UniProtKB/Swiss-Prot annotation:
Residues 43-154 form the THUMP domain. It catalyses: guanosine(2445) in 23S rRNA + S-adenosyl-L-methionine = N(2)-methylguanosine(2445) in 23S rRNA + S-adenosyl-L-homocysteine + H(+); guanosine(2069) in 23S rRNA + S-adenosyl-L-methionine = N(2)-methylguanosine(2069) in 23S rRNA + S-adenosyl-L-homocysteine + H(+). The gene is rlmL. CDD domains: AdoMet_MTases (cd02440), THUMP_AdoMetMT (cd11715). This is Ribosomal RNA large subunit methyltransferase K/L. Its main location: cytoplasm.
C-alpha cells in the first residue's frame, strides 16, 4: 500500500474525504486543504482519473522530523531517487512552508535539489537536469511544525484542468469547485433536472453532465505526473483508462437527466456549447441566450445551481443588489418545489435575495472566500401579496422609512430645481440616522455617499442598511440602477477628497444659474462642483460686475466662472493642482469665456498670498479644513490659521473691496474679537448662502463677508 495526499481548495476537505472513501481508499484523514489516504497503485490510478474534487494527488515518499538544514538534506538524500526517476528526465522542486531554521522556501528547495543531485552522483549516475518550467518529474515538499514531507506529484498539472475548456469567460469557475457545488447541494446523490441561469462558459452544467453520464473527469487529460515515474505500471493504467472509456460511451446513451443553461451573453453561450462538445456532453444540455429574470422552470421540480455575478466578478453594486432581489422574488413566485444553490462572495448580495437558507457553507473560488447557500422553495410559498413594481422591487418591503422620505424630498426638490435653473442638487442627507448616506442628483444620475458609521454600530448592520438603501432607491425616485454610483465618505483628512478613485471617467455637463460646468462622477470622491456652495458662487457672480476678482483654493474654478459671467473686470484663479487648473480652463471654455483678463495660476495658495503685490475688489476663498500636502511649505489648519490668513488677504483688498470666506469645518469658531482689533469687519452670511437642498444640514459650511473697518 502507498501513502498519498490529495490537495484541494479549503472547504473541500469533507467532500473529498467522502469521495476517497467511496473509491475504496483507506486511512482517510482530513487535513487543511486536503486529505491523507492510503491506496494500492491501481486504486491510486483510478482515483487520479476519477476524482472530481482534488486539485492534485501526491505520493508521499518520506515524512519525518526536521530541525536543521542538515536534517533536511539528509531526509532528501536517504530517498532512493534513481529508483523513482531517470536521470534523463528533468525535475523540479515545489517547496512550501517555513519556520524555525527555515525562513526561505527557496533555500529549502535548494537543499532538496542538492540532495537529489548528490544521490545520483554517489550512485555513479550522471545527474538529472533541473527545469523550472514544465519539468517531467516534480517533487512536492512541505515543511510544517518541524516535520518535512517529501512527495512526488503523482497527478501532474492541476486536476481541475479537465481538458474540455477551450477559453474562459471573464469570470471562470474552476471545474472542481463546480463539482463540489453539485456534491454539497445534494444533486450528485439524487440527480434530477438541473438549471443554471448564469451558465457562463457552462462549467456547472458540464460537470453535472459528466457525473450523470458516468464520464471520468480525467479522461481527456493529456499528461499525468506518474508517466515519468519508474514504478509506473502502464498496463494497469491502460486497463483503467479503457474501462473508463467504455463507461463513458454507455453512460451518455443511458443518461435521462435534463440539463438547461442560459446566459445573457451570447458569446458565453457559444463558448459553453463548444466546451460541452469538447467534453462529449453537448447532446445532454440545452443552452440558450436569455436574461435570468425571464426564465421559467423547465420542470415541476429540480435543482437550480449557479454562480451569479458578484462584486469581484461582474457588474456594479447597485445593479447587482437589484438583480439579487428580483431573483429572490422570482424564485419564490415561480420555482416552488425546486432547490436553489448559489455561490457568492458578497453577503449583502445574498441577503438581498430575502430567502432563508437551509444550509450555509464556506467555499473558496481561488483566493476569494465565498458563501454557498442552499434554499428549499416550497410549492405554496410567495414573498407577500403586495404588488411588485415593474422593476421588481416592492418599496413596502425595503427600508420603507428611507424610501418614503427620499421620494417626498425628490418630488419637492425637482420642482424647486427647475424653477432655480439647476440640474444637480442633493435630495437626501442622512435625514434618517439609520440610513447614514447622502444622495446627490446629477442630471439623470445619482451619487450615493456613505458616511462613516459610529464604531458602536456593528459592521453587518451598516452593510445591511446600505444594501437596503441601494435596493430602495430605483423605485423610490424612478432611476435606472446602472445610473447609481456608490462612494464612501469619511471625515476629511488632509487632501483625501482630492485623491483619485477611478481611472475611468463619467463626464457630464451641468447647468447652474446659466453657467455650465464639467463634472466627473467617477474619477474622484467629489465631482468637480461643491453643491452646497451654489448660492455662494451666485453671490460672487452678483458682486463681480466691473471688479477685479481673485479666487483662491479655486478647485475647478466654478466661482471664477460665475464672476466672469457676472461682468468682472478681471478674474484670477489660483490652485495648487495642475489638474484643477486645467479643469477650470475647461469650464471657462464651456461658457465661451476667453481673454487676457482671465488668469490661471498653479501655485501653493499660501505662498502666492505672501508674494502677491496686487489689489483686488472681490476675493473668494474656500480653503481646506486641513492640509499637509507635500507641495505646501507648511501645514494648514483653518481654525488655527484663519486669523493670519484673513489679515494677509485684507492687505490685498482694495479700500471698498469685499472678501467672501467660506469653509466646511463643522465646529469652526471665527475669532471676531481679534479681527475687530485689526480693523477688520466680519459678518456671518450663512442665511443667504445655504441652499434649500441643504436646509436639513445647516452646518455643512459657514460663510463670512469681510471688509475693511
Amino acid at each position: 500500500m502507498l501513502n498519498f495526499f490529495a490537495a484541494a481548495p479549503k472547504g473541500f476537505e469533507y467532500s473529498l474525504a467522502q469521495e476517497l472513501t467511496e473509491f475504496g481508499a483507506t486511512e482517510v484523514k482530513e487535513s487543511v486543504a486536503g486529505v491523507y489516504f492510503t491506496a494500492s497503485l491501481a486504486l491510486a490510478y483510478r482515483i487520479t482519473l476519477w476524482t472530481r474534487l482534488a486539485s492534485r494527488i501526491v505520493l508521499v515518499i518520506y515524512k519525518g522530523s526536521c530541525e536543521s538544514a542538515e536534517q533536511l538534506y539528509n531526509a532528501a538524500y536517504c530517498v532512493d531517487w534513481p529508483a523513482h526517476f531517470s536521470n534523463k528526465s528533468t525535475f523540479s522542486i515545489d517547496f512550501h512552508g517555513t519556520g524555525g531554521f527555515l525562513n526561505n522556501t527557496q533555500f529549502g528547495a535548494l537543499k532538496i535539489k542538492d540532495a537529489i543531485v548528490d544521490r545520483f552522483r554517489d550512485d555513479d549516475i550522471e545527474r538529472p537536469n533541473v527545469s523550472r518550467v514544465d519539468a517531467e518529474f516534480k517533487v512536492d515538499a512541505h515543511f510544517r511544525n518541524g516535520v518535512i514531507t517529501i512527495a512526488m506529484n503523482f497527478s501532474g498539472p492541476s486536476l481541475h484542468q479537465r481538458g474540455y475548456r477551450s477559453t474562459t469567460g471573464e469570470a471562470p469557475l474552476k471545474e472542481n469547485l463546480a463539482a463540489n457545488m453539485l456534491v454539497r447541494s445534494g444533486w450528485q446523490a439524487a440527480p434530477s433536472t438541473l438549471l443554471d441561469p448564469f451558465c457562463g462558459s457552462g462549467t456547472v452544467l458540464i460537470e453535472a453532465a459528466l457525473m450523470a453520464a458516468d464520464i471520468a473527469p480525467g479522461l481527456q487529460r493529456s499528461r499525468f505526473g506518474f508517466e515519468h515515474w519508474r514504478r509506473h505500471d502502464k498496463a494497469v493504467w491502460q486497463e483503467i483508462v479503457e474501462e473508463a472509456k467504455a463507461r463513458a460511451s454507455l453512460g451518455v446513451k443511458r443518461c435521462e437527466i435534463k440539463f438547461y443553461g442560459s446566459d445573457i451573453d451570447s458569446r458565453l453561450v457559444a463558448l459553453a456549447k463548444r466546451n460541452a462538445e469538447n467534453a462529449g456532453v453537448l447532446e445532454l444540455i440545452e443552452f440558450k441566450v436569455a436574461d435570468a429574470l425571464t426564465i421559467t422552470p423547465p420542470a415541476e421540480s429540480g435543482y437550480l445551481i449557479t454562480n451569479p455575478p458578484y462584486g469581484e466578478r461582474l457588474g456594479n453594486v447597485s445593479e447587482l443588489l437589484q438583480l439579487y432581489y428580483q431573483l429572490g422574488d422570482k424564485f419564490k413566485k415561480e420555482f416552488g418545489g425546486w432547490k436553489v444553490a448559489m455561490l457568492c462572495s458578497d453577503i449583502e448580495l445574498v441577503s438581498s435575495l430575502k430567502l432563508k437558507a437551509d444550509k450555509q457553507m464556506k467555499m473558496f473560488n481561488g483566493a476569494l472566500e465565498c458563501a454557498f447557500n442552499i434554499y428549499t422553495l416550497h410549492a405554496n410559498s410567495t414573498r407577500r401579496d403586495t404588488p411588485v413594481l415593474p422593476d421588481g422591487v416592492d418599496i413596502a418591503d425595503i427600508a420603507p422609512a428611507f424610501a418614503n422620505r427620499i421620494k417626498k424630498n425628490a418630488k419637492l426638490l425637482e420642482k424647486w430645481a427647475k424653477k432655480e435653473g439647476i440640474d444637480s442638487y442633493r435630495i437626501y442627507d442622512a435625514d434618517i440616522p439609520e440610513y447614514n448616506v447622502a444622495v446627490d442628483k446629477y442630471l439623470d444620475y445619482v451619487i450615493i455617499q456613505e458616511y462613516m458609521a459610529p464604531a458602536t454600530i456593528p459592521e453587518a448592520v451598516t452593510k445591511r442598511r446600505l444594501s437596503d438603501v441601494l435596493l430602495a432607491l430605483p423605485s423610490a425616485i424612478g432611476i435606472n440602477p446602472n445610473k447609481m454610483i456608490m462612494k464612501t465618505r469619511e471625515r476629511q483628512k488632509g487632501t483625501s477628497q482630492y485623491q483619485k478613485l477611478d481611472e475611468r471617467k463619467l463626464e457630464l455637463i451641468t447647468t447652474e444659474y446659466g453657467a455650465k460646468f464639467k463634472l466627473n462622477l467617477t474619477g474622484y470622491l467629489d465631482t468637480g462642483l461643491f453643491l452646497d456652495h451654489r448660492l455662494t458662487r451666485r453671490l460672487v457672480g452678483q458682486k463681480s460686475k466691473g471688479r477685479r476678482v481673485l479666487n483662491l483654493f479655486s478647485y475647478t474654478g466654478s466661482a471664477s466662472v460665475h464672476a466672469a459671467l457676472g461682468g468682472a473686470k478681471s478674474v484670477t484663479t489660483v490652485d495648487m493642482s495642475n489638474t484643477y487648473i486645467a479643469w477650470a480652463k475647461d469650464n471657462f471654455a464651456l461658457n465661451g469665456l476667453q481673454g487676457k483678463q482671465y488668469e490661471f495660476v498653479q501655485s501653493d495658495c499660501m505662498q502666492w498670498i505672501r508674494d502677491c503685490n496686487e489689489q483686488y475688489d472681490l476675493i473668494f476663498i474656500d480653503p481646506p479644513t486641513f492640509s499637509n500636502s507635500k507641495r505646501m511649505e507648511d501645514s494648514f489648519d483653518v481654525q488655527r490659521d484663519h486669523v493670519n490668513l484673513l489679515s494677509s488677504l485684507v492687505k490685498l483688498l482694495s479700500p471698498t473691496g469685499e472678501l467672501v470666506f467660506s469653509n466646511n469645518k463643522r465646529k469652526f469658531k471665527m475669532d471676531i474679537e481679534t479681527l475687530t482689533k485689526m480693523n477688520i469687519n466680519v459678518t456671518n452670511i450663512d442665511d443667504v448662502t445655504l441652499p434649500m437642498d441643504y436646509k436639513r444640514n445647516p452646518h455643512i459650511h459657514n460663510t463670512w463677508l469681510i471688509t475693511h473697518a
